[in-house]
Amino acid sequence: MVSKTFILMAAIAYVEARFGQEQVPIAAIQAVQGGNPGEAATIAGAAISDLLGAASSCAKLTRADEIFTKLGGGADALAAAIGMVTAEKNTNPSANGNAQNVCGDASLPATPELRGITPLIDPAVDVDGKAAALSQSSATTPLQADGMSVFDLMSANGLGDLANAGASKGNNASNNNAAAGNNNAAGNDNAAA
């Protein structure tokens, strides 16, 4: 009985620790000094839902744009927005093969200072750490991103097999990833006939 309790407690602690890693940018958003009174806290509260696995993969990029523009565009707003772009989305390792959805909309993020930055993905998928290294380096030195989505950037850096190109709401994400040799779109039941 004691061992079952211990295993259950360890599992709960692991899940809480993983979820906590995905919530890293929230405190930075709340701490931004620009914008109207209470606006940083409101945006931070809304940003939590953008990091959930079921949320649109492009929603966090739209939120990052909002952080920068509505909270004054200062250094703290930029740092918080970069944190949102690089934040790992919460995913369910037991659902959909732990699919890592990354925005396939080349217009996002719209803020020039946020373009060319790639996100972290679940370390259970990024087993060699290449996506984490790219995210860290692109946060300080953004990649050339003209006409490219975040998914395109990852794919161009050899990481397209780790993620799926997600669409923003109302976007069909027809960015030819399947035609370019990436079968993430063509290799699943969601592909168009």
Model-flagged regions — what are they?
Residues 1-21:
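Fungal secretory targeting signals
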Residues 21-193:
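Mature extracellular/secreted ectodomains of secretory-pathway proteins
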